[in-house]
Amino acid sequence: MHQQHSKSENKPQQQRKKFEGPKREAILDLAKYKDSKIRVKLMGGKLVIGVLKGYDQLMNLVLDDTVEYMSNPDDENNTELISKNARKLGLTVIRGTILVSLSSAEGSDVLYMQK
């Protein structure tokens, strides 16, 4: 009777090392805006305003007390908000891939603008 050995039994098990590239710094320092109200314009003409609770280097955001507004489709600059279509979202995660711009809700400081 012949015993069959698989190749994995003959070789000692090797630990696979997970590739870890250099840690990237955030595109912008949002730490000073943590627990502050920010205004986030999203692709598709939506705007959300909420309190920044967290973020990562990919610009994914966690906002609390978030309110979503639809902008007027005829307004090219998206400055006119349709407040009757405001929705309270509460705690929200926003993916960095859909951000158009990010600014302070109190002032007019633009923190981030998509190129």
From Swiss-Prot:
Alphabetized SUPFAM superfamilies for the sequence: Sm-like ribonucleoproteins
Basic and acidic residues composition-biased segments: 1-10
Record key words, sorted: Cytoplasm, mRNA processing, mRNA splicing, Nucleus, Ribonucleoprotein, RNA-binding, rRNA processing, Spliceosome, tRNA processing
Domain Sm: 25-108
GO terms of molecular function: RNA binding
Superkingdom of origin: Eukaryota
Protein's recorded name: LSM complex subunit LSM7
